[in-house]
Amino acid sequence: MAAPVMTVSDSKDLRGLNLIAAHSHIRGLGVDATTLEPRASSQGLVGQEKARKAAAVMLQMIKEGKIAGRAVLIAGPPSTGKTAIAMGMAQSLGPDVPFTTLASSEIFSLEMSKTEALTQAFRKSIGVRIKEESEIMEGEVVEIQIDRSVTGSAKQGKLTIKTTDMEAVYDMGSKMIDAMTKERVMAGDIISIDKSSGKITKLGRSYARSRDYDAMGVDTKFLQCPDGELQKRKEVVHTVTLHEIDVINSRTQGFLALFSGDTGEIRSEIRDQINTKVGEWKEEGKAEIVPGVLFIDEVHMLDIECFSYINRALEDDLAPVVIMASNRGNSRIRGTDYRSPHGLPLDFLDRVAIINTHSYTPEEIKQIISIRAQEEEVDVHPDALALLTKIGQEAGLRYASNLITTSQLVSAKRKAKQVEVSDVQRSFQLFYDPARSIKFVAESEKRLIGNTGAVDFSVGAAVSNGEEKMDLS
């Protein structure tokens, strides 16, 4: 009898949607929870202690809801971790506080005005925590009886459900029977039924029925039988943004516009009505305003009209904390001939709290590259790590980070498990850094097409032996 053929798949598991991005290694700001003192290297962030401490103070005030309508500027040279600090703040805020990221160039669109794009970004960054009381039934299913008529008319049934204190029998209609069948509810399950919507949630199985089957799935959860009354009132908290409420109330298709992305321009009258309604909910204690964070990267790309709008928007009652990043020095404000620090108007710069970042030390660059290598699952030899650190100092941290993956591909070509110095050198020769690219452009300027569109093909046509003219013989 022939042995069965064994097949081995050597394909790697895909990471799904969790792809490796530039800041995917950042888990938080890396500060002590009580003293807010920054650690040397923690949660993916290295160095920049003063900037991280300042960001942590802002973060603490945002969490406590003490500040809103403030503007913070993170300013520093390129590759000094400005966006990384903002991403660390986003990770530390948690899921309940809205955090919106916006690149300055995103607001310049033919479909939507600049002020509308900024308004939507501001309203995405303001959360509304709505409290709602719902009546639920929670207990252990004792028995389910379903009567199916011979004629095929509507099904009827009875549900017996109990807690440790009481037991009750309820009549079920066809919709409830279908929901029970869909959730595969059986005797011994502990379920929760929302009376207002009829939603059935299967919480787990009772400990009393744990020996009913010899084998169970890994997702089977055993719980104690609930005690007290069968019917209870439970407070449910939903957190939505003002922009989501705007979209639902402004479009004929309602909440479907949230998924299609076709929000378009939203009229100011609708926003005013929503603001009034949210204010009423707040006074009645039904809702709570959660001021979030709007992060605008490359803020110097905004024009003077946008700065004027942000100036006014920060004075509004419903305004988030605006965090901006800029790597410019004295530069021209877009839309004017004026020059200003960081490319921001002086009257706007007056309102801004500025956090400075400085260049990384060689040791900090080494730690960052090591963290990136771990995130990308690349084993780097210590000598290769030292070379990447040197490249990071001279050519820039981004370029050195990009060389990690390319060096790993070069090492995989020779079936090596560790990235060596030769692999980094090979990648360095294949891919130019900005300095070498500038040098190449300067040397080949006449061969490249200039502003006028002219190019001189005669230059550089000489062969390598030093002849001035091309020899075709």
UniProtKB/Swiss-Prot annotation:
| Keyword Nucleotide-binding appears in the UniProt entry | yes
Q: Which GO terms describe its molecular function?
A: ATP binding; ATP hydrolysis activity; ATP-dependent activity, acting on DNA; helicase activity
Q: Which domain of life is it from?
A: Eukaryota
Q: What is its EC number?
A: 3.6.4.12
| Gene3D superfamilies found in the cross-reference section | 1.10.8.60, P-loop containing nucleotide triphosphate hydrolases, RuvB-like helicase, domain II
A biological-process GO annotation: DNA repair
Reactions catalysed according to its record: ATP + H2O = ADP + phosphate + H(+)
Q: Which family does it belong to?
A: Belongs to the RuvB family.
This protein's name: RuvB-like helicase 2
Species this protein is from: Gibberella zeae (strain ATCC MYA-4620 / CBS 123657 / FGSC 9075 / NRRL 31084 / PH-1)
